[in-house]
């Protein structure tokens, strides 16, 4: 006779839904990539899709920033460019997605 499987509380639960907001600087950066390099724009889109699922792990080698950027995280877009974001509760703020921590 098969044993019944008990579910642990929270097992299989979906992660909380997180809202993503873009700062005006991040919007300008995204517009730059839309016009100049669609491959980088696609990479940014993949990173932004992953952040709500895994804010502090996942693709792009996430790392916490320090000093004046304390509280923010970055992920690698390319060797030169980083996506910088902040997580506050269930809200994610994308600060920039061009250059290296301006």
Feature-to-residue mapping (PLM):
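Enriched for short, Lys/Arg-rich terminal
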Residues: 1-19, 27-42, 46, 59, ...
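Generic structural signal for secondary-structure transition and capping sites
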Residues: 53-56, 70
């Amino acid at each position: 006779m098969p044993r019944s499987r008990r579910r642990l509380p929270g097992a299989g639960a979906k992660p909380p839904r997180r809202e993503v907001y873009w700062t005006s600087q991040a919007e300008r950066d995204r517009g730059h990539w839309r016009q100049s390099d669609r491959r980088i724009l696609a990479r940014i889109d993949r990173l932004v899709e992953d952040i709500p699922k895994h804010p502090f792990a996942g693709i792009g080698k996430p790392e916490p920033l320090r000093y004046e950027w304390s509280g923010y995280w970055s992920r690698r877009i390319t060797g030169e460019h980083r996506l910088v974001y902040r997580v506050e509760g269930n809200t994610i703020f994308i600060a920039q997605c061009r250059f290296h921590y301006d």
